[in-house]
A protein has these predicted regions:
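Pyridoxal 5′-phosphate
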Residues: 1-374
Length: 374
């Protein structure tokens, strides 16, 4: 098997509809498998034939299995997991239930995701920047000092950013937080299904539609019992037998999407998480090798960064959103134009984000390199 795990790429590709172009945008939304698409459609059809709540009850064992396997990815139990509608919704749910005093400090990266900062401030919390190195990577020793001198209410760590493919030293930060007795909340929106998130965080949240390649409209929130006991749901459950985290699930949830996510996680596990991570990291390296310098574009990340996300700074005078539009219109290549609002404390201008999944090929990366060079 080659370092790129080409057999894994081929099997992942064979389970999906044929691409109309070149999809290199999995950090935005991955391509679902035919099996996942069929399962979502079948559940929706059964809702129409039998009634939504009848089918919901019948599907509960499968949904519960999903809580279990997702909990396993996060190092938690099924009882610790709640389905929500998105990663953004998961953070909103957590903050609404925690009800921390106004002005409470929250340590986060200088390159924190812009919408996360907005949510923290809307909840009355005060973000405090964690110390980082020149690549924007958290410095565990300096974070340890910060927690000792002025412990925040919790640490919020975005494991892998929306604007940059730099993997944070989350395991080291988790150990530092644990030793200091400070809760760690891990934003795994770009990490779940991409890098290992079983690190001992007190809360982990993520989404279906990115690296797990599940349906849109589904997110997941995992909270360990010690922290869950401090949360107050807006609508407490009347069923004392249900785990406390179940009270944070909406009865208007996208049940068909949850079923699709359960199947998508099954496909991820069948592929082998270690092999998935290895191929994604290899594709990230191959992307950076091919794209750095093409047409004057420069890669932001270090060459060996173990992620599949690559961001490109444009040459002077080049419009990034216009380039994205041109790539789609002229070459059928899908990427993301990421503006500085994604990380207002770190970004000074837009970047082009490239994020191949397992089914991407080197020919597709070469096609992008050629398109950028012309």
């Amino acid at each position: 098997m080659s370092p790129l795990h080409d057999d894994l790429g081929a099997s992942w590709r064979a389970r999906r509809p044929r691409q109309a172009g070149h999809h290199l945008d999995s950090a935005a939304c991955s391509r679902q498998s035919t099996r996942v698409l069929d399962a979502v459609a079948l559940h929706a059809r059964h809702e129409a034939e039998l009634g939504g709540y009848v089918v919901l009850q019948a599907a509960e064992p499968l949904v519960q299995q999903g809580r279990s396997v997702l909990g396993g990815l996060m190092g938690m139990a099924a009882a610790d997991v709640a389905f929500v509608e998105s990663a953004t919704g998961a953070l909103a749910t957590l903050l609404a239930g925690w009800r921390l005093p106004a002005g409470s400090a929250v340590a986060c990266l200088p390159g924190e995701y812009g919408p996360n900062l907005m949510q923290l401030r809307s909840a009355g919390l005060s973000p405090v920047a964690m110390p980082v190195d020149g690549a924007g990577r958290a410095d565990p020793a300096a974070v340890e000092s910060l927690l000792a001198q002025a412990p925040p209410a919790f640490v919020h760590l975005t494991h892998l950013g929306s604007h940059r493919g730099t993997v944070q030293p989350a395991a080291d930060i988790a150990a530092v937080c644990r030793a200091a007795g400070v809760p760690l909340v891990l934003d795994a929106a770009q990490a779940l299904g991409h890098v290992d998130v079983d690190l001992g965080a007190d809360a982990v949240y993520g989404t279906s539609r990115k690296w797990l390649a599940g349906p849109r409209g589904v997110g997941v929130l995992g909270v360990r019992p010690e922290l869950a006991a401090r949360l107050t749901p807006a609508l407490p459950s009347s069923d004392a037998d249900l785990p406390p985290m179940r009270a944070f699930e909406s009865h208007e949830g996208h049940v068909a999407g949850r079923i699709g996510l359960v199947l998508a996680v099954g496909e991820h596990l069948a592929a082998g998480p270690d092999a998935v991570r290895a191929r994604l990291a290899a594709l990230g390296r191959a992307t950076r090798e091919r794209l750095d310098g093409c047409g004057g574009w420069s890669v932001v990340e270090e060459l060996g960064e173990p992620s599949a996300i690559t961001t490109l700074r444009p040459p002077d005078g080049v419009d990034v959103p216009a380039t994205r539009a041109r790539l789609i219109a002229e070459h059928g290549i899908v990427t993301t134009a990421a503006g500085p609002e994604r990380a207002p404390g770190e970004m000074t201008g837009p970047v082009l984000r490239v994020s191949p999944h397992l089914d991407a090929t080197l020919d597709q990366l070469d096609a992008l390199a050629n398109a950028l060079a012309t």
